[in-house]
Each structure stands twice: as structure tokens, then as C-alpha cells.
Amino acid sequence: MGVPLIQQYRVARYVLEQKLRGRRRYPLVLMLEPLFRCNLACAGCGKIDYPDEILDKRLSVEECMAAIDDCGAPIVSIAGGEPLIHKEMPQIVQGFIERGKFVYLCTNALLLDRRMKDYRPSPYLTFSIHLDGTRQRHDASVCREGVFDTCVAVIEKARAQGFRVTANCTLFQGETAPEVAEFMDIAMALGVEGVTISPGYSYERAPRQDVFLKRRASKQLFRDLFKLGKSRRGKRQWYFNQSPLYLDFLAGNQAYECTPWGNPTRNVFGWQKPCYLLVGEGYAKTYRELMEETEWERYGTGRNPKCNDCMVHCGYEATAVNDAFRSPLKALRVMLAGPRTDGDMAPEPAIVYREEPLPRPHLVGKGSGTVATIAAPVSRHRKASG
């Protein structure tokens, strides 16, 4: 189980090619949001708080193909919104597969049962099922009862039909290591390939702001979880759909800075600056403009107040992959022994900004209606001097 060898090989070859060409910045995963419309309203989601004019927008098949052709990443993660609402999603997925890209189709599973017939099992296609814990925890997270049971049934059906399936789990405040361990046991029993797991990012537009983990609490939770995992002799092994060094970072053992260009985001507004998570920083018209004109040094923990508690894989997985190429023996040790679960944690990045009041992104009215345009002020923070 875990990431298939063919995918590991293709990604490793791609990274090596970029390094041999001397490229400092290159993408690993294209984050594609072809729509923001969703059939759930999760408490911790900051992606769907838009008027109908925006929720009704879609990226076309041609726009999606142009995005992957422009950036060239070996992996595409299709998010949203709920991607299965998009009527052209089968053609979009097939277009990526024909280009030899590994596709993770993220879904809450509510539509997958009846849409599964539109797809064929392939080593290049994975259904990434949103599953935020055990039944009680997940249903509370998505604000609807019965969704967990739907996910379980759909996972079993997809696995029976030969599809690759992973679970995508976001952890929030109040969760305990034993509770997460119980979820991991459930996920492994369902036969998923692995679990993508990370602390939730505190979206400014999320309906609830009291559910997000702080950075220190996140690290301790993962240490406690991995400690439980190491004590499970004779029980089913846990598989994560992430690199060993990223998991080691979650446990507080690596002092990583984020690599936002590793997961560039294309959505209905354009190429989102600087990453998948930050809303309100503006958009580039082209991938080249995103890479060349984004002020990357303004972002990251210690560099921007919006980034301070972020430990999400879309920012740090690329950092971990690069570190594995620089320090293969370290990566091998962590892969064999697992993340360290005691001792001092790695130091946090120094704060190099002075925080100033930051207005929330807002919708701009025009005439009698609301236009489909988001005001996107640049973060108002300055580097500290001296």
C-alpha cells in the first residue's frame, strides 16, 4: 500500500530533471479548482463563500488542459468546491491521464456513487475521499449527518471496481491522538491506499474560526499519534499518502520553510497568489506571471501573519521532497524508523514582519447587484528592521 512505485519513480525522475536543469522553482502538484460550487457547507471551509455569479463559473476543458501544459507538474489535484458537480469532469480527467499525469480527484463522495460509471480504473486516477475522522467527527465537520456512512459505502464500491482510493483528512482543534488513531484503523480496514493528513488551515472566510489548531498543538498531536502508531505491535500498519520527511515535519522535527510555488493553484479567477490557501492576495493571468512576478519572499511562517500556523501539505510537502534529495540518508532513516516522538522540537522561524491591521477580503458591489469580483488587498505587513 502507499504511493505506487510507478508514481514514486515518475515524480523522482521529474524532480531530478528539474535539478539537473538548474531550476530553483518548479511545481510538483497543480492544484486545480475548476469550480467553487459545493453540495456541502463545512465549518472549516474557506473556499465556497462567494455569490452565485462566482459559484456558477466553471473552468472549461481547454482551460484545464492549458493549465497543466503551462506548468508541467507530474501530479494534478482537482479540488473545489465539489469537482463532480462539473459536467465536463470526465473529459478533464481523461485529458490529464492522456498527458501521463497522476490525477487526484478530491470529492466528498456524495455524488461519486452515480458518477463512478463515468470513469475507468487507472494507475493515473485516484479518488481522494474527504474523510475528517470517525463518524461523529466527520459528520460534525461537514455539518450533515450520514455523510460518513456514504463515504464508507462509496470507498468500498470504488475499491471493488478496481479504483485507486485515498482518504483526505484534515485535523481540527479538540481532536485527540487516540481518536485520530481510531480513524486511521478504520481507513486501513477500508483498504484505502493511504491517508493524506494535515492540520486545517485557518481560512479567513471559514464559517467558524474556533476550530483550527495552533502550530505547537499540531506538532504535539502528531507526535502523540505517531507514538501510538509505533506501539501497535501486531496490528494493521498505517499508510500515509505523504513523504516521510513531511510527516517528520508535522511531528516538530524539521525546521522547514514553505515552498508555495510547489503547488500552484489555477481556479476561475486565474492563477492564485501565492498558494492554494491564501485568499485575497491577487491573481496572475498566466502561470509565467505567477512564477515571475509573485513576491515569494513575503510569504511563509514568520514572513506573513496569515501563514503563522500553517503546516498544510500544499506548502510543505515540496520542501520535504527537496530535502529528501539533499539528504537521502536522513529521509531513509525517517522512513525506516518513523518520525521522532520525543525530545526537543525544531525551532520555529523567526518573525520578520511587523503586523498591521488587515481588512478581510470582501465583495465589491456595483449598481443594483454584486459583481463577480473579489477585492484582493495585498497583505499589509512589513519586514522588521534591525
Spans of features found by a protein language model:
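The −1 position to Zn-ligating cysteines in a subset of zinc-ribbon hairpins
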Residues: R37, A41, E257, K306-D309
